């Protein structure tokens, strides 16, 4: 909270920075339409053999095609991402916004904003949310990682601790 790191914390930051620096990460903050993302992903697959594509977040994307509604546009985007994943043989993680009413309760698949196609096209859907809504500004709190859709297996939930100071999920020890 103070912005001052201990010597141990600074050492961890330095070590993490070195690890990240050596990773083959490619960050594109300019591409906003799905057609350009397809081109960019194919180039990266051919040139760098990428093994994962992450979209932050799906509802920010646009299509160059003229469609009748935003729902149709998001459907085209998710379908394109699904086909791209199959073509490039890599997982694609698409972060999504939820409808506003989902913020107060346990989210469900129909809370995915702007399209039912997101839940239909996704192989897996995972929600992360607070176990209890409270007014306390806790630094560490329990959160639920909720796998609500898994095309190849069962759904499940797990409770973990989340440390806001360092954005870290911590497994709870089972006794």
List each model region and its residues.
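Active-site-proximal loop/turn and secondary-structure-junction residues that shape catalytic pockets
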Residues: 31-33, 59, 98-99
């Amino acid at each position: 909270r103070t912005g001052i790191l201990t010597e141990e914390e600074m050492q961890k930051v330095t070590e993490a920075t070195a690890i990240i620096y050596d990773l083959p990460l490619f960050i594109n903050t300019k591409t906003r339409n799905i057609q350009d993302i397809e081109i960019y992903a194919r180039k990266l697959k051919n040139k760098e053999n990428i093994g994962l594509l992450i979209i932050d977040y799906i509802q920010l994307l646009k299509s160059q095609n003229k469609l009748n509604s935003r729902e149709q546009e998001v459907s085209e985007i998710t379908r394109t991402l699904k086909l791209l994943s199959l073509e490039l043989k890599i997982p694609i993680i698409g972060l999504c916004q939820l409808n506003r009413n989902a913020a107060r309760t346990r989210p469900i698949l129909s809370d995915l904003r702007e399209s039912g196609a997101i839940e239909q096209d996704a192989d897996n859907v995972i929600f992360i949310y607070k176990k209890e809504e409270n007014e306390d500004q806790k630094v560490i709190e329990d959160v639920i990682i909720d796998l609500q859709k898994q095309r190849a297996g069962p759904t499940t939930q797990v409770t973990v601790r989340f440390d806001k100071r360092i954005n870290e999920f911590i497994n709870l020890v089972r006794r």
